[in-house]
UniProtKB/Swiss-Prot annotation:
It is found in: Cell inner membrane. PANTHER family: NADH DEHYDROGENASE, NADH DEHYDROGENASE [UBIQUINONE] IRON-SULFUR PROTEIN 7, MITOCHONDRIAL. It is an enzyme of class 7 (translocase). InterPro entries: NADH_UbQ_OxRdtase-like_20kDa, NADH_UQ_OxRdtase_20Kd_su. It comes from Edwardsiella ictaluri (strain 93-146). GO terms for cellular component: plasma membrane; respiratory chain complex I. Binds 1 [4Fe-4S] cluster. Its cofactor is [4Fe-4S] cluster. Gene3D superfamilies: 3.40.50.12280. This is NADH-quinone oxidoreductase subunit B. It holds the Pfam family Oxidored_q6. HAMAP family: NDH1_NuoB (MF_01356). The gene is nuoB.
Length: 224
């Protein structure tokens, strides 16, 4: 599996936030296995254990912009019970949150606020873009709406829909957990490589392409 290596590069020529450089590399732990089987397997076990704890204890930042936030909050009710994924502890401060859900329309005046709140979140941190407006501006193709929050912050998971259902938000959590389980992050700020390795997961569009092409009979809206 290929990984995207991200390193902070404040002196680089990148004019977009964040100031970093990226490159596609192979799994760094495989190199440790080739050098030393014992230490390589130990690194694998340590990363698996740390990633297991991270992905099963995701605390979302309580931050909503529009109607998509209503659907997000609905997933916290007993009907959907998002507590099964360890993501029911809403945080009112970005310094205590693990990931941010940008749910709704991002206006130009709100973009600096979102970026500053993202900067206040501690590493490791992730971002979910929820809804068509957050993904690409939606139906608001005007000067006052940002055409996608990935213009100023990195996004890990995109949720399509206007607005998405609570089940879509829960699926996004599961996809984020799957991605976190494959990450390779520094175990300490003084131990090992300080780069962040994120697995290049296959998109849901590509994964379901053959299944969708094979569909020949479409149900009417009243049959769904």
């Amino acid at each position: 599996m290929d990984y995207t290596l991200t390193r902070i590069d404040p002196d680089g020529d990148n004019d977009r936030y964040p100031l970093q450089k990226q490159e596609v590399v192979s799994d760094p732990l495989e190199q440790h296995v080739h050098r030393s089987v014992y230490m390589g397997k130990l690194d694998h076990a340590l990363h698996d254990m740390v990633n297991w704890g991270r992905k099963n204890s995701l605390w979302p930042y309580n931050f909503g912009l529009s109607c998509c936030y209503v659907e997000m909050v609905t997933s916290f009710t007993a009907v959907h019970d998002v507590a099964r994924f360890g993501a029911e502890v809403l945080r009112a401060s970005p310094r205590q949150a693990d990931f941010m859900v940008v749910a709704g329309t991002c206006f130009t005046k709100m973009a600096p606020v979102i970026q500053r709140l993202y900067e206040q979140m501690l590493e490791p941190k992730w971002v979910i873009s929820m809804g068509a407006c957050a993904n690409s501006g939606g139906m608001y193709d005007i000067y006052s709406v940002v055409q996608g929050v990935d213009k100023f912050i990195p996004v890990d998971v995109y949720i399509p829909g206007c607005p998405p259902r609570p089940e879509a938000y829960m699926q996004a959590l599961m996809l984020l957990q799957e991605s976190i389980g494959q990450e390779r992050r520094p175990l300490s700020w003084v131990v090992g490589d300080q780069g962040v390795y994120r697995a290049n997961m296959q998109s849901e569009r590509e994964r379901k392409r053959a299944e969708r092409i094979a569909v020949t009979n479409l149900r009417t809206p009243d049959e769904i």
